Amino acid sequence: MNIVFFAHPAFLGHQSMPRFAQMLADGMAARGHTVAVWAPEAAFSRLSAPGPLRKWLGYLDQYAAFPAQVRRRLRACPSDTLFVFTDHALGPWVPLVVGRPHAVHCHDFLAQRSALGEIPENPTGWTGRQYQALIRRGYTQARNFISVSRSTAADLQRFLPAPSVRSDVVYNGLNQAFGPQDPGAARVQLAAKTGLPLADGYLLHVGGNQWYKNRRGVLELYSAWRALSAHTWPLLLIGQAPDAALVADHAISPYRADVHFLIQADDALVRQAYAGAQIFLFPSLAEGFGWPIAEAMASGCPVVTTAEAPMTEVADTAGFLIPCRPATGGTAWAADAARTVEQIAALGPEARAQAVAAGLANAQRFTAAHSLAQIEAIYQDIVRTPTAA
């Protein structure tokens, strides 16, 4: 096949989406397909400008300069070229290739739902609502979709004006080599690298400051667990620097001296952190997929996560489930969820080994090779099917 992948521009500084696009491109190239990646380049956005104006200059690169480049490039593309949008948020470009074989990968519709007022925890301003409407007008013209979870696929169908010609679900494959390590050795090495007191064990969260990551809930849960447990393991939060709200919550925590933020950790260190953690906390309010659940399980770490889709799709029966944190009543929620955390903390060696083994077995569902094989078969079917254009 000849495949063109549309990807987010590098100048936006995204991390997970460029990795996903690269995994697709590398995977299809390794399978013998001819691959190209098209993405806007910085021209207007390279100009010196204050922050808000710089964002609008980026829009010029994405929605004025880039479409003109695409129209020129299309003339040289064979008629059987498959055009793949690596994220439905690239929807404004979909009309450029409508009528030709195409596919749209869908990760989560949280921004779309927020723009329609469906998520009170994440209100969206007027310009944000217009931007999401522009995205929706684009991707709803597509006919073939691949979602990362059944939950995402269900949201997609709500937003489409009519049923799509094709809608498949393919779970994400892990795009790094996650695997178990000796936990004690991992902790000692991590403590040496970071200078933090992690050698005797720790609880872990990996994620950014997005509202749905519920980092404030992680702090609440940790404090509630410490209040009832004889264990004094610290909490390690890997991701962005804490925002103002999280800094304020941290400042009033009675266990703040045992809460450590690790900013911009490299991939190798994250893998080591998973392998050494006693328990991985992932109380997200929502997700498109929930990569860290599979990453932690593949690393041999028991996972506590929310009893809501798609977290339940990823964790399956191998996770320890807690209720979703309500908009109010976080203290009561944390006290209840802390009992589940303590249940894991109290496991004996044999029971913990069983929990770890269940997670490792579950994580086998999320190999990159399996995901890429499924995606390749879908791509080939789209190219073979005239009505899929």
Question: Model regions: which residues?
Answer:
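Carbohydrate transferase catalytic cores enriched for Leloir-type hexosyltransferases
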Residues: 1-389
